[in-house]
Amino acid sequence: FKEFDKRAGIVVDIGSSVTDLAAVREDKIVAGCSFYIGGAYYTQQISDYVLKKYGLQITFAEAEKLKLKCAGLYPNDVSFGTVAGLNINKGAAEEITVTAREIYDVLAALTDKLCQVVTSLLLTVPQETSAYFKESPIFLCGGGAQLSGMEKYFFDKMNMGVLVPSDSFLAAVKGAKLIL
């Protein structure tokens, strides 16, 4: 993050199974934690939703396809996706259409939990540095940061600036490169 130079900020790396958070100031981590909700958990929750609502058991790959095609954090999104699976009530294959609006509630609930963890992290920042973080942005990275609407959702919930680089899924690798 070029925007991060000599500033403070909260880094939220939404990986596949874990989200890592760090409050960083002047190249030092002053507080951090890991939260066991990542992109794969979002996908699993979509699969669970489809099973509960439609009685359709879909594979993780089908749920991931749905997440990538139409899921997002825009409540008025009118897109939709089609998934196929096993109807557990009929014992037969079936294909259904799921709207982005349906999935929004599932994703919003998970992202609200993530925002709560960021808020908790901000409360653990040492008092003498807390003012820096109130004026600093949240940096979202990792593959999960690419979820449609994630940046705006965080901005609306956290009332803080939010930055997501176009290559956010490579942020951890690029960061590791700097220390090697």
Protein language model regions, located:
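Conserved helix-loop functional segments at active or binding sites
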Residues: 120-128
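Extended, folded domain segments that form the structural surfaces/walls around functional sites
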Residues: 1, 5, 13, 147-153, ...
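Phosphate-binding glycine-rich/basic clefts of nucleotide- and phosphate-handling proteins
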Residues: 25-115, 123, 133
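A short acidic Gly-Thr/Ser loop motif
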Residues: 4, 11-18, 24-28, 38-40, ...
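Conserved phosphate-binding catalytic cores of ATP/NTP-utilizing and phosphoryl-transfer enzymes
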Residues: 1-12, 174-180
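Conserved phosphate-binding/catalytic loops in two-lobed NTP-binding clefts
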Residues: 154-177
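Residue-level signature of catalytic and energy-coupling elements of molecular machines
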Residues: 13, 46, 83, 118, ...
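Glycine-rich phosphate-binding loops at beta-strand->alpha-helix junctions
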Residues: 71, 75, 129-154
